Each structure stands twice: as C-alpha cells, then as structure tokens.
UniProtKB/Swiss-Prot annotation:
S-S bonds: none
Keywords: ATP-binding, Nucleotide-binding
Keyword ATP-binding: yes
Gene3D superfamilies in alphabetical order: Phosphorylase Kinase, domain 1 (3.30.200.20), Transferase(Phosphotransferase) domain 1 (1.10.510.10)
All residue ranges annotated as the Protein kinase domain in the record: 10-298
Family per similarity comment: Belongs to the protein kinase superfamily. STE Ser/Thr protein kinase family. STE20 subfamily.
Ranges that cross the membrane: none
PANTHER family attached to this UniProt entry: SERINE/THREONINE-PROTEIN KINASE FRAY2, SERINE_THREONINE-PROTEIN KINASE FRAY2
Pfam annotation, one family: Pkinase
Protein name: STE20-related kinase adapter protein stlk
Length: 346
C-alpha cells in the first residue's frame, strides 16, 4: 500500500483519540480512502519522543497482518505524522465502555485472541517482547484484530547477540502496571522473557469477558501484593459464583458486581482453563503463544468469523456518543496544515 508523504494530501476529518504522545485522526487521502493519522509534536520531553522513535523503528521491522503497521512516517514543521490503515471499530477498551459494557461474547473474544496470538507468535519469533498487551491496544475491523502500541516493545538482540532474559521494566506509566506480569514487578536479577506477554493476555481475557479491567479502583500496592502471591484473576460467571458459595466479592474492585449479571453468564471450561494457563505465576508453566493457538478454547473459531460476530457492531456504535477523549465532532476540516514540502521522512 503506497501512501503520500505530503500532509497536504490528507484531509483530517475528526479526532479519534488524544493519547499520551499525540493525537490520532480519522483522515482521507487524495483517493478518498480512509486511514488513521497520528500527529505528534516534537516539542515535548525527550522520554516521550524516545517512545515514539522506538515504536517507529520496531514496527518498521515487523510485517504481519495482525500488527498495526505504519504505512508512512514524515515530518512537517514541528510535527511528526504517522499513517496507519483505518480500523473502523476502534480499540476494544472503547467498545467495552460503550457497547459491550458487560463484556464481549466468548466467541468474539476467541476470534480476537486468535489474531492477537498470531501477532505475538510472530513477534516472539523475531525475538521481541511487546510488553503492553491490553484491550486498549487491540484494534478491530470487520475482518481482523490487530495489535498496536509498540512503544514499550523490547528486543532480545543486543549488540548482535541474543539474550536469554530481559531486565528492567517494560512499562513507563503507572496505569499499565495492572496488565504487567509479576516477574516484571519483582525487578530482580532473574529478568523475564516473552512469557510476560502471555500473562498480559490472561489479564486481557478477564478484562474483555468481565467488562472492566482487573484490579480496577484498587491501590497499586494491593495489586502488587496479589500478583506476587499468585492470586488468580477469574472470569466472572455463574460457575465462579458457585465456587465461591453464592457470594463473590471481588478483590480487584471496590464495587460489588451485581449478582444477576454474573448468574446470566456462563463461560466454557476451555475458556477458564485458557485463562489459568496464561496467568500461572511461574512463567515456565505458561504456554507459548504458538502453543496457545492450539488450545481447545480457540476451536470455536472454526465455523465463524469476526465479520459474523461483529456484523451488528456498526449499528450499535452509531447509538452512542463518544466523549471528548474519543471523538470531537467539530474537528472536521479544521486541522489541516497549509501545503508545503515535507522536510524528511523515515
């Protein structure tokens, strides 16, 4: 897919997201084709720009249908512009807040995870760790899910040699820690491997199935203690309720979930087992991404597709109004810079 490196060839239609580093717009190119354009100011702390450069350099090396590939990247005046293929359903976190408020259907989760695991299998085979898997970083279209946000991606290759372990933190902001594996939180000399992404998959399963992030509204210290102890997050359904003798008080939120919401849910035993495998405290006992793709939980993907499962999503999305952090209705036509030559591209 060829894409122009001249900002005057794009019409920025509306703001999709105001992120930590930049703003993402829905845009059209000169052929009226929709795409996403990320606009990043160079006038910000170097640590944020380093995250941007890390993402660009990493994604340029990775080519996979389930990775949110950068189509082009260029500089105009004091802004860096990155263009991506447009994923019309946005990210899974926004969908949880506005459409699937009680969680995604299990079959939809299986289809989404199949694509994400395919991306992780490839990423790990290229000796990288994504380091930030969560619903917010999974984008959807009618035909596929893609993994995005490679700002915290790390490589096992250093100075031409492959390391066995990675040391240090993969996350730079507090709110990402809820999805982080315990071995990263330890910050000890043992380091960690690509299995931290598998743990994050387990947390993301709970997030997408239950309708909210695990450990929501709890202190970081409590979350840290629970993970170090090996306390498992669970899929909340009638089976969870029965196992807890009819009363399930959630340790990871200050609010009690309505009992009738839980009793009306029933996840398969395969799904429960899949999550337990991902959230094993011992990283050596977690399955690799490639092995998880053979798990019985994903067999339900065989006779359906994302297109089948999400066919009514467009209509559902039209019924909710996104807040100011997700879309600005007055953004149309007001964000285009004046035409000029591109200074550089990479």
């Amino acid at each position: 897919m060829m894409c122009s490196n001249n900002i005057s060839d794009y019409k920025l239609l509306e703001i999709l997201k105001n992120g930590m580093i930049g703003t993402v717009y829905k845009a059209e190119d000169i052929n009226n084709k929709c795409l996403a354009v990320k606009k990043v100011s160079m006038d910000q702390p170097m640590e944020k720009l380093t995250l941007l450069f890390n993402e660009v350099l990493t994604v340029r090396r990775l080519q996979h249908r389930n990775i949110n590939t950068i189509v082009s990247c260029f500089l105009y005046k004091q802004y860096v512009y990155l263009t991506y293929k447009f994923m019309c359903f946005g990210n899974c976190e926004v969908l949880l807040k506005n459409v699937y408020t009680s969680g995604f259907p299990e079959v939809a989760i299986a289809l989404i995870l199949k694509d994400v695991l395919s991306a992780l299998t490839y990423i790990h085979s290229e000796h990288y760790v994504h380091g930030s898997v969560r619903a917010k970083h999974i984008l959807l279209s009618p035909r596929k899910a893609v993994l995005s946000n490679f700002s915290y991606c790390q490589s096992f290759i250093s100075q031409g040699e492959k390391k066995t372990f990675i040391f240090g933190s993969t996350v730079g902001i507090e709110k990402e820690l809820y999805w982080t594996a315990p071995e990263v939180l330890y910050q000890n000399l043992s380091g960690y491997t690509e299995k931290i992404d598998i743990y994050s998959i387990g947390i993301t399963c709970c997030e997408m199935a239950n309708g909210f992030q695990p450990f929501k509204d709890t202190e970081l210290t409590y979350m840290y203690i629970e993970k170090v102890r090996g306390s498992l997050q669970v899929l909340l359904d009638k089976n969870s309720l029965l196992e807890n003798q009819g009363s399930l008080s959630l340790e990871h939120t200050n609010k009690r979930i309505a009992r009738d919401v839980i009793v009306n849910k029933s996840f398969s035993e395969n799904f429960h087992q899949f999550v337990e495998l991902c959230l094993n405290k011992n990283p050596l006992s977690r399955w690799a991404a490639s092995k998880l793709m053979t798990h019985s939980f994903l067999k339900q993907c065989r006779n359906t597709s994302l297109l089948d499962q999400l066919k009514d999503l467009g209509q559902k999305m039209s019924k909710f109004k996104r807040n100011e952090h997700e879309i600005f209705s007055d953004a149309r036509g007001s964000h285009n810079p004046q035409p000029n030559d591109t200074i550089w591209k990479f």
